[in-house]
């Protein structure tokens, strides 16, 4: 045989040995793997169907989480919201814990949750106050009627405290919408940039006409980027003193000076006391030349 053909044959064998071979799976292994996959799918489907049936039957609810902290705080939030709504309806009398749980449909909670509500949750909640062992809603402003609302707005205006949020009034005044509508032009509404409404007392004694040119000048001045110190410095440069300089000044208490302690005369020990009548002092006589 030609030696060149033999060399080519040897090279072909080496290349064949170096290249990886891909073998086909046997039919039995493929069948077993497909059976395993089907079994897993059937098991997952059965568990999912069980969960779906539980949801459809209504067995999965908050009561299943009765031992968790989320359930406790959910009950607390529901109680506070209920006490708020009944206060806004005009039912301001306090209730016992059993009455609250009955009206909120939570009589089936455990003893630990009841103890937690009585000893910690309701007592320390800023929106709940305890009155003779009973619980009532505690609004920011406890208002009885429209007259109380008008007095509160007038007090805020006189003290320079500004207005009051409408949501705070709705929280503390029963049937607040009727009361606000009945006051009419005695109050003013101002909308904040965050779309919250603020109520102000409409002091009719302060109503006067202002020149339009002055209004334009007033609105053209922007002080958003300036703080109180910068505004005060600018006013001082213009020769304008702030209101706090013209107000009553506090009198500083007079500090009494402490008297210096009297110095005791120092006593010197004298020597040669037995020669007091014999010795003479010659310091006044000038020395002779």
From Swiss-Prot:
Modification N-acetylmethionine occurs at: 1
Residue stretches of biased makeup (Basic residues): 255-269
InterPro entries, sorted: TFA2_Winged_2 (IPR040501), TFIIE-bsu (IPR016656), TFIIE_bsu_DNA-bd (IPR003166), WH-like_DNA-bd_sf (IPR036388), WH_DNA-bd_sf (IPR036390)
GO molecular function: DNA binding
Residue numbers of N6-acetyllysine PTMs: 72
GO term, biological process aspect, one: transcription initiation at RNA polymerase II promoter
Region annotation (Disordered) ranges: 17-61, 242-274
Positions of post-translational Phosphoserine modification: 59
Biased composition (Polar residues): 48-60
Cross-referenced Gene3D superfamilies: Winged helix-like DNA-binding domain superfamily/Winged helix DNA-binding domain (1.10.10.10)
DNA-binding region: 64-144
Keywords annotated in UniProt: Acetylation, DNA-binding, Nucleus, Phosphoprotein, Transcription, Transcription regulation
Main location group: nucleus
Family assignment from sequence similarity: Belongs to the TFIIE beta subunit family.
Subunit structure, as described in the record: Tetramer of two alpha and two beta chains. Interacts with FACT subunit SUPT16H. Interacts with ATF7IP. Interacts with SND1. Part of TBP-based Pol II pre-initiation complex (PIC), in which Pol II core assembles with general transcription factors and other specific initiation factors including GTF2E1, GTF2E2, GTF2F1, GTF2F2, TCEA1, ERCC2, ERCC3, GTF2H2, GTF2H3, GTF2H4, GTF2H5, GTF2A1, GTF2A2, GTF2B and TBP; this large multi-subunit PIC complex mediates DNA unwinding and targets Pol II core to the transcription start site where the first phosphodiester bond forms.
PANTHER family: TRANSCRIPTION INITIATION FACTOR IIE SUBUNIT BETA (PTHR12716:SF8), TRANSCRIPTION INITIATION FACTOR IIE, BETA SUBUNIT (PTHR12716)
UniProt name for this protein: General transcription factor IIE subunit 2
Native source species: Bos taurus
Gene: GTF2E2
